[in-house]
Amino acid sequence: MKKATLVIGVIGADCHAVGNKVLDRVFSNHDFRVINLGVMVSQDEYIDAAIETGADAIVVSSIYGHGDIDCLGMRERCIERGLGDILLYVGGNLVVGKHDFADVETKFKEMGFDRVFAPSHDLEDVCQLMAHDINQRHDVDTRILEEAI
């Protein structure tokens, strides 16, 4: 069976590399194929890599607190580039200052992200949730294909 492919990186002007390396290791150890773009990644770089690799999901990290600015319009850009149905995940310290995480989560979901993870979210759970989402997406795609045949 084909491994699910994740495009990961740290968005915008954020140069926090350590967490990104941790994510790469954890995701790889959970049998994901990881395309790690590193730090200071633009929206278009994520999308280009997702197109080139046939990725199942894009995982955006932001630690410096400007994720809300850097991620604005990402779903729309995915749609424009033909990836309207790609799974979009975001996590980290996404906004400057202290905010109730429920408000942050709502904001990013309204921006088109499928799941939003707080900095303290357990990575085992993140892996399970992503695997579930990807498997569910593949099951739907398979049923649609079978119905079309």
Curated annotation (Swiss-Prot):
SUPFAM superfamilies listed in its UniProt record: Cobalamin (vitamin B12)-binding domain
Cofactor: adenosylcob(III)alamin
Pathway: Amino-acid degradation; L-glutamate degradation via mesaconate pathway; acetate and pyruvate from L-glutamate: step 1/4
Residues the record lists as binding adenosylcob(III)alamin: A13, D14, C15, H16, A17, S61, S62, I63, N93, L94, V95, V96, G97
Key words of the record: Cobalamin, Cobalt, Isomerase, Metal-binding
Its EC number(s): 5.4.99.1
Single Gene Ontology MF annotation: metal ion binding
Domain B12-binding: 3-140
Annotated InterPro entries: Cobalamin-bd (IPR006158), Cobalamin-bd_sf (IPR036724), GlmS (IPR006394)
Keyword Isomerase: yes
Pfam hit, one: B12-binding
Quaternary context: Heterotetramer composed of 2 epsilon subunits (GlmE) and 2 sigma subunits (GlmS). GlmE exists as a homodimer and GlmS as a monomer.
HAMAP family registered for this protein in UniProt: Me_Asp_mutase_S
Protein name, as recorded: Glutamate mutase sigma subunit
Originating organism: Escherichia coli O157:H7
Organism taxonomic ancestry: Bacteria, Pseudomonadati, Pseudomonadota, Gammaproteobacteria, Enterobacterales
